């Protein structure tokens, strides 16, 4: 028995991407944006295929991502930001709602929506995941978006 395997390729040449980034913890967000843009360009895309939307914080990411997704102008939405644990339970609420909200946007709109939002215990961990020791999670989120766009085109 031969099973047909369908998977996405890593070709960004003919796709349009919206980056939706939280301005809270902006210097981390900017590093994630740089990683996402680098990924798209390395995989055949260009900066002309990318639009950058900035929102106040991680809680606003899902609503902006949905507005962008339903516009029909983009093949994928890449959400980026950093939620860093503080002394109160605010972190848990924002991290959970941002995660659930972004996931729901993908289900509601049926276009790829990826999650490049860091949820870390401290600033050092966020810096590590925004381009130092642990790679750049913005790059990773863009890579997933590229693959998902190409997979969706085959379904």
Swiss-Prot record:
Enzyme class, UniProt record, top EC level: transferase
Binding site for (2S)-2-hydroxy-3-oxobutyl phosphate: 87-88, 129
Pathway(s) of this molecule: Cofactor biosynthesis; riboflavin biosynthesis; riboflavin from 2-hydroxy-3-oxobutyl phosphate and 5-amino-6-(D-ribitylamino)uracil: step 1/2
Binding positions (5-amino-6-(D-ribitylamino)uracil): 24, 58-60, 82-84, 115
One GO-annotated biological process of the protein: riboflavin biosynthetic process
Active site: 90
One Gene Ontology term, aspect cellular component: riboflavin synthase complex
Gene3D superfamilies registered for this protein in UniProt: Lumazine/riboflavin synthase (3.40.50.960)
Annotated catalysed reactions: (2S)-2-hydroxy-3-oxobutyl phosphate + 5-amino-6-(D-ribitylamino)uracil = 6,7-dimethyl-8-(1-D-ribityl)lumazine + phosphate + 2 H2O + H(+)
Keywords: Riboflavin biosynthesis, Transferase
InterPro entries: LS, LS/RS, LS/RS_sf
Organism superkingdom: Bacteria
UniProt-listed Enzyme Commission number(s): 2.5.1.78
GO molecular function annotation: 6,7-dimethyl-8-ribityllumazine synthase activity
PANTHER family xref list: 6,7-DIMETHYL-8-RIBITYLLUMAZINE SYNTHASE, 6,7-DIMETHYL-8-RIBITYLLUMAZINE SYNTHASE DMRL SYNTHASE LUMAZINE SYNTHASE
Function, in words: Catalyzes the formation of 6,7-dimethyl-8-ribityllumazine by condensation of 5-amino-6-(D-ribitylamino)uracil with 3,4-dihydroxy-2-butanone 4-phosphate. This is the penultimate step in the biosynthesis of riboflavin.
Family per record: Belongs to the DMRL synthase family.
HAMAP family per UniProt: Lumazine_synth
Descriptive protein name: 6,7-dimethyl-8-ribityllumazine synthase
Organism expressing this protein natively: Prosthecochloris aestuarii (strain DSM 271 / SK 413)
């Amino acid at each position: 028995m031969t099973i047909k395997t369908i998977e996405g390729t890593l070709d960004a040449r003919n796709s349009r991407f919206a980056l939706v980034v939280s301005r809270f913890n902006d210097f981390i967000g900017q590093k994630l944006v740089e990683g996402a843009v680098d990924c798209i360009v390395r995989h055949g895309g260009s900066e002309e295929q990318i639009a950058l939307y900035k929102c106040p914080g991680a809680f606003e990411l899902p609503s902006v991502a949905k507005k962008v997704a339903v516009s029909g102008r983009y093949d994928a939405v890449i959400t980026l930001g950093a939620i860093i644990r503080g002394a109160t339970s605010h972190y848990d609420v924002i991290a959970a709602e941002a995660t659930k909200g972004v996931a729901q946007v993908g289900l509601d709109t049926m276009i790829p929506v990826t999650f490049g939002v860091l949820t870390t215990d401290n600033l050092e961990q966020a810096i590590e995941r925004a381009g130092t020791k642990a790679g750049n999670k913005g790059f990773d989120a863009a890579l997933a978006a590229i693959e998902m766009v190409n997979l969706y085109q085959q379904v």
